[in-house]
Amino acid sequence: METLSFDSSALKKFVHPNELGEMQAMVTAADSELRNGTGAGADFRDWLHLPTDYDKDEFARIEAAAKKIQADSEVLVVIGIGGSYLGARMAVDFLHHSFYQAQTAADRKQPLVLFAGNSLSSSYIADLIDVIGDRDFSVNVISKSGTTTEPSIAFRVFRQLLEDKYGVDGANARIYATTDRQRGALKTEADAEGWGTFVIPDGVGGRFSVLTAVGLLPIAVSGADIDQLMAGAAKAEATYVNPDLTQNEAYQYAAYRNILYRKGYTTELLENYEPNMTMLAEWWKQLAGESEGKDQKGIYPSSANFTTDLHSLGQYIQEGRRNLMETVVKLAEPNHNVKVPSAKSDFDGLKYLEGKEIDWVNTQAYRAVVAAHTTGGVPVMTVNIAKEDEFTLGYLIYFFEVAIAISGYLNGINPFNQPGVEAYKTNMFGLLGKPGFEEIGEQLKKEMDD
């Protein structure tokens, strides 16, 4: 099959064919805003041509740094949160063995890529230190500013660990900072200490940054082919340029989401039938939620892992509130297949499946779920992908990025800012006693005591 295809055939009872056509003028306008820079947030559109217009010299430095880390480290600790975490984590999970972390070094062949700075759990940090043990390791700290609380705390911990193990000079040779090109606390410290540095481009927001050094260095260290990742994204960039809805499946997805949203389907479940796509949904949730959830509107992004979650969420999806729509990422060709074996006893009633490939069973489950859920009043869309490889992943990343950008403009918002994330941070800094936030902290404590 082709690398990616979008299937809207299960929407027939929910969307009249004329409705998609009526969206064309709005989609064309949204496309113009995106490509001509006339829409809100225009300064953050550099991801749009990133698959073909990127810094080739930096790309070569990323590949060289990855080889060095592979040569001198058994573990790479990637420190970041949000877009500085989810893209790389998603790709490592998507492209590697389902039990990647449990593989032996000989089987894995490349360093184990682990993640920190994505929570404030002290137990997680302690456990990660325990897992690293006496193995050689390097650190990739990712932050535009260098002052984001979670990664900054984690970096202090792992920098100290490096210095205790290798000395200051040895530690500095194992630290790689992905940060602003010219300014910020992390950039200043990196230049002073001589760390290897890579750039977070000014015109690329965190949730759109997986195809920059933010994602590419950890992905390359894991042993994945980042040239193929970029090639897949470049193919998608070339594919999704025509705003004609009969020709552009990414724009179809954006249009259908908005049609359904306006009919009251306000929550979208991104679903998969492969466990190693769990983090794909986490990455997508930030991409969609942070792009669209503003001005008291927007589709709420959620996720489910099938068939597992059919045994927990299945009842609600089938008969709960009718505010759900589903988008399934369906894999056509798994990396491995296993057949249902024959057995002496048919105590489990599976004789009728003997000799069948488990992936075939998985596909029939998917077909049955689509039929049941649409009958129950839940619209279902499917994004079919050919394989779990780098080219396909790059293509899929770009599909979702351009679709979400168009979807945001269709809903009349700026898809590239995130002003709402500052509210909790201001309160947290007040409660932590950060200089400059004391008054806020005192007010909050008073309110909480009352």
From Swiss-Prot:
The active site is at 290 (proton donor), 311, 425. It catalyses: alpha-D-glucose 6-phosphate = beta-D-fructose 6-phosphate. GO terms for biological process: gluconeogenesis; glucose 6-phosphate metabolic process; glycolytic process. Its EC number is 5.3.1.9. It is found in: Cytoplasm. PROSITE patterns: P_GLUCOSE_ISOMERASE_1, P_GLUCOSE_ISOMERASE_2, P_GLUCOSE_ISOMERASE_3. Keywords: Cytoplasm, Gluconeogenesis, Glycolysis, Isomerase. GO terms for molecular function: carbohydrate derivative binding; glucose-6-phosphate isomerase activity; monosaccharide binding. Disulfide bonds: none annotated. Pathway: Carbohydrate biosynthesis; gluconeogenesis; Carbohydrate degradation; glycolysis; D-glyceraldehyde 3-phosphate and glycerone phosphate from D-glucose: step 2/4. The keyword 4Fe-4S does not apply. One of its GO terms (cellular component) is cytosol. It comes from the Bacteria. Belongs to the GPI family. Catalyzes the reversible isomerization of glucose-6-phosphate to fructose-6-phosphate. PANTHER family: GLUCOSE-6-PHOSPHATE ISOMERASE (PTHR11469:SF1). This is Glucose-6-phosphate isomerase.
